[in-house]
């Protein structure tokens, strides 16, 4: 049951960018799509926030960091990135997050890391060089790559904050953290995205998925209900039922699923070297994630993929 839920979560998370990109290409600003996703999911998760309202008093810094970095920061950077580069490439760049976390642990906190973790970092960086085709002078939009890297850095920012908070005597309920993170993220994004300036008429029309028209409201419904609410809930439940190693492997499947969906539904094809590089990135991320020190937050990070790897109990990356 746990493995089934983990696979459902990976598929749901993997489809977020594939559903969001047609809306962006139809005329919505990436920030507006992020706001719709986060605000809609926050509304659905509001009952959980009420149920866990004691978290506001017990862990305000953690909730603020989750909302600012893991929700608003990661999603804004990721959706802005996929408006400029392929979905699969953006997500694979995000998979540098576990490697960046280990870099922070080793060089800033000056805590030891294992040799296997160092190998994972080298693999992740080397694989990324293949994904972005450095030999061709970075064939992708530089700003798009920078935004994807920004999403990875936001995950590291949340790790740093939650790692400092992890000495607390009691771990908060992850669903409560998600609910408040979405509410805080929605509040921040409302100020930044200014949704009152959105072209709402786009949502009443259609968006093209590789030339096939799809109702915009269906894509939005997928992003909010499936790729956010259902993905988080199934992800949290599955992590509680699986070992950290299995959960980490399944989390890596999100990038594979997103790349395949983008290939089939959006026509975003990757070259053979990019596919090989993507496999190497995922292998490096998995090794880095599974070889990290034992001290870690147990709260999930918004967005899936490497964010979800950072949430696996018993790991720091």
Kindly label every feature range from the protein language model:
Residues 32-43, 79-118, 151-152, 245-263:
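Specific alpha-helical transmembrane segments that line the substrate/conduction pathway
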Residues 34, 38, 133, 218, ...:
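C-terminal-most transmembrane helix of multi-pass membrane proteins
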Residues 45, 101-102, 137-204, 300-317:
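Transmembrane alpha-helical segments that form core, pore/gating elements
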Residues 12-17, 46-94, 130, 224-242:
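Specific transmembrane alpha-helical segments of multi-pass solute transporters/efflux pumps
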Residues 19-22, 40-59, 123-139, 183-216, ...:
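Membrane-interface helix-cap regions at the ends of transmembrane helices
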């Amino acid at each position: 049951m746990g493995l089934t839920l983990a696979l459902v979560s990976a598929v749901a998370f993997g489809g977020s960018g594939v559903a969001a990109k047609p809306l962006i290409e139809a005329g919505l600003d990436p920030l507006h799509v992020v706001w719709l996703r986060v605000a809609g999911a926050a509304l659905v998760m509001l009952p959980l926030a009420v149920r866990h309202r004691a978290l506001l008093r017990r862990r305000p810094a953690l909730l603020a960091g989750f909302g600012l970095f893991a929700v608003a920061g990661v999603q804004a950077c990721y959706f802005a990135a996929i408006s400029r580069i392929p979905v699969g490439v953006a997500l694979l760049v995000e998979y540098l997050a576990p490697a960046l976390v280990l870099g922070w642990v080793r060089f800033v906190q000056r805590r030891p890391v294992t040799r296997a973790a160092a190998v994972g970092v080298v693999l992740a960086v080397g694989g990324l060089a293949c994904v972005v085709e450095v030999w061709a002078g970075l064939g992708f939009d530089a700003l798009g790559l920078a935004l994807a890297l920004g999403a990875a850095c936001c995950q590291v920012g949340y790790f740093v904050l939650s790692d400092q908070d992890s000495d607390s005597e009691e771990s908060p309920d992850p669903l409560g953290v998600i609910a408040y993170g979405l509410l805080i993220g929605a509040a921040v994004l409302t100020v930044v995205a200014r949704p009152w300036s959105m072209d709402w008429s786009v949502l009443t029309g259609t968006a093209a998925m590789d030339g096939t028209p799809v109702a915009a409201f269906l894509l939005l419904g997928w992003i909010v209900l499936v790729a956010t609410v259902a993905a988080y809930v199934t992800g949290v439940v599955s992590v509680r039922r699986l070992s950290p190693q299995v959960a980490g492997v399944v989390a890596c499947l999100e990038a594979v699923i997103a790349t395949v969906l983008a290939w089939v539904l959006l026509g975003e094809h990757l070259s053979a070297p990019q596919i090989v590089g993507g496999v190497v990135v995922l292998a490096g991320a998995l090794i880095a994630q599974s070889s990290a020190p034992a001290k870690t937050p147990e709260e999930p990070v918004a967005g899936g993929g490497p964010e979800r790897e950072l949430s696996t109990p018993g790991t720091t990356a």
